[in-house]
Amino acid sequence: DLAGDFADPHGTHIVCFHAVLEALKQIKSEGDEWIKDCWLWLYKGAWEEWNIDEIQMAIPMSPDQVLRKRHGIFIHQSQKDMVPFQGSDAREFWQRVEVRNANTARLYADLGLTHYAAMEAFVRWEY
């Protein structure tokens, strides 16, 4: 998966997206068979979520999985404590992510689906 928040004011997400996309296109053009089974899934980022009608895959998370995700975020130095590009939101990265994922789970519950602790949403990028 890859961040699909191309409105990132510092351009990090779009630079990474283009690097991954070019690598995938190169592998595809070289005819490697395994690439036919690879899909590129984009998550939105810490600040926003995809609109519910845009989401193509949603991964439900239990409270334990939310904690594991938080610990995964802590592993990345750029996402710990005060991040270099904080923006106007004073919360730490993991706090924004957990609220976003909980809100997505609530949206699905409001539609009549099972209510989970959190849900990560993805959109597939065709390359």
Segments and roles (model prediction):
Residues 1-127:
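Metal-dependent de-N-acetylase/amidase catalytic core
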